Each structure stands twice: as structure tokens, then as C-alpha cells.
Amino acid sequence: MAKEGFLVGEALVGEEPEIAHIDLIIGRKEGPVGQAFANSLSQPRVGHTAILAVVRPNLPVKPATLIVPKVTIKDLEGAELIFGPAQSAVAKAVADAVDEGVIPRAMVEDLVVIVSVFIHPRGKDYQRVYRYNYAATKLAVKRAMEGFPGIDVVLEEKPKAAHEMIGFRINNLELPPYLGVELVFDDWRRVEGILRSLPRKDG
């Protein structure tokens, strides 16, 4: 890893409302990620307070990992999901990544990790929150360290774009299912009349 560079990872795991969406960056303490880590920890934001990932109370994981909630925490129930199962899951995933050699053990004191965690406001099941966030964090770390996805994968997959949280499948805009019409008239009023008669939406 370059001294001033950082790695990016993302993963979506599970089902609503406990679905886990993890975005993370991994970088050196003396680089931009280290600076962002220190700023986030020293300048808390209301509803998005960053917390250290701990394997258990009084035992922060290595490399030092910061958890930043994506959704504004508005009540004690939301706070408990972050400070409980999500915090433990992220820490366990990072520790396992080191144990399995995904993150080099020799670099744990040089690196920091910032993990942006999505907790659905309707999430209730602590076990699901833990399992999904563990799996998503571990996958995101692996993807970051491996540089996934490469640009070839992105370009190959972009026509098949779909996202389960959108609720619909995106059409291939390179081959739009639209009717192409060429109008050649001298009288603009005739063109306007034809355009007004066209349906405003599909189906």
C-alpha cells in the first residue's frame, strides 16, 4: 500500500430491515485516512458519533477501526444496535481478517480502518444485525485489500445494473426501449400537436 494512498471496500449483505451495507477505507496512520480517523474521533457529530470497534469492552481491535453510523441515531434503541451487535461484528470481522492473513499482521500498527455502517431504523433482531454486519465487513475488507472490483469487472457488469434496495430493475440505457421518431415539418404547430398526442409515460 502506497504511503499516501488508501483502499476502498464495499459490501451489502442480508435482508431488510437488518440488512448491512458497509463502506470502508483502509490506509496508513500518517496518510489521509489517519487524518480522517483523528478528525472523526475528536469532532463528534450529533447522531453520527464515531466509535472505536472493540472485540470486547476495553479491547479495541487492531488495526484501529472507527465505526461511523450512516443513519442518524435518534433514540436509545438505535444507539444500542450500533454500540452492541454492529460494533462487535465489525471488530470481529477486522480481527478475523488479520488472523486469516487478509490484512498483513505486520501492518496492524501502521494502518487504520474507517467503517461506515448502515443500520435500518426498523432493525430489531440483534443476531441478524451482528451476522450481517460481520459478513459485510469481512467481505468489504477482503475486497479492499484485493482491489475489487477491477475496471474490467465494472465495465462488464454495468449493463446488468441492479440494486435490490431500488425496487426495480434498471433498463439497459445503451439499448433504450424507446420509440425513435423523426419529424420533418415546416409548420411547428403540427409538430407540437403530434408531440402533445404522445403518451407521457410507458404502459
Short names for language-model regions:
Residues M1-G203:
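Accessory interaction regions appended to the cores of large information-processing enzymes
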